[in-house]
A protein has these predicted regions:
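Membrane-proximal HAMP signal-relay module
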Residues: 1-68, 72, 77-88, 92-94, ...
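DHp/HisKA dimerization helices and adjoining segments of the cytosolic kinase module
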Residues: 77-192, 197-198, 214, 220-248
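Glycine-rich acidic phosphate-binding loop
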Residues: 208-215
């Protein structure tokens, strides 16, 4: 009968459900799937072994990226300092100085990229455990002060509408990284004489900015290294960092295009 068939196949359905809900690098429930059928027991054992190998590979990959990024920091800093010393040499010709400046810009880009990769690794590893109650309204205004000069340089107008206070318990460094990456994004993908509107409610923060008259690819914009249109100095990791922080904090982040403006919304 159908009931007998379902009863016999139940261990398979339990295993499939466990595999479907399994997330590498996360805290997963142990497979609890007792069965007298030898083939299903072997299948259970094989699935658990495969999951364990996947976890080991995932941990090794995270450690490699983290260690590599950390070790690269010192030689990058040394190279940058030596280049700056060379650029102070009065005997350099204009062409030589120009080439050194180009090299310095490339080195600055690599340094930014390395720092972003290191931050992503720390987020993935769950290393930001020190949390406290934060009010992001005040923190956002503090972050904006750091960008006032560059916004003024491009005549970008910034307005904040505070409908309520946005409170959250999280690591302060991560909160700053989340807000600054969205502020950077609104600047980099804006235009001279453009505008940025930030709307804060009790459960959401929305960044709206003028820019190109075309919507971004919402399926890929949060992927690491994705750049719909290459912007000078952009690593392609800013939105990926924002997305990783939101997922860690159980926040939702979404993009939409409305009234010729690019909108990024953080939702509790």
């Amino acid at each position: 009968s159908v009931w007998v068939f379902y009863r016999n196949m139940r261990p398979l359905y339990v295993l499939l459900h466990w595999l479907d809900s399994y997330q590498t690098g996360k805290k997963n429930e142990a497979l609890n799937n007792d069965t007298q059928i030898t083939e299903f027991r072997k299948l259970n054992d094989a699935a658990v072994r495969y999951a364990e190998r996947t976890e080991q590979m995932f941990e090794q990959q995270k450690q490699f990226i983290g260690n590599a990024s950390h070790e690269i920091q010192t030689p990058l800093a040394i190279c940058r300092n030596r280049l700056e010393m060379l650029m102070d040499d009065d005997s350099l010709s204009e062409n030589q100085l120009g080439e050194l400046m180009k090299t310095h810009q490339t080195l600055e880009y690599i340094t930014k990229l390395n720092k972003s990769l290191l931050l992503l690794t720390k987020i993935d590893n769950g290393q930001f455990t020190d949390t406290k109650d934060l009010e992001l309204n005040t923190l956002l205004k503090q972050c904006l002060e750091d960008y006032k000069e560059v916004y003024d340089y491009r005549n970008i107008e910034v307005n904040i509408t505070e409908q309520d206070r946005f409170h959250i318990v999280m690591n302060e460094s991560l909160a700053v990284a989340l807000l600054t990456n969205l502020l950077k994004n609104a600047f980099v993908h804006n235009m001279d004489g453009g505008r940025i509107q930030i709307i804060i409610t009790k459960n959401s923060i929305t960044f709206r900015n003028s820019g190109s008259g075309h919507p971004l690819d919402e399926e890929h914009i949060f992927e690491r290294f994705y750049q719909g249109s290459k912007k000078e100095g952009s690593t392609g990791l800013g939105l990926a960092i924002a997305d990783s922080i939101c997922r860690l904090q159980h926040l939702n982040i979404r993009y939409y295009f409305e009234q010729e403006e690019h909108c990024f919304e953080i939702l509790k």
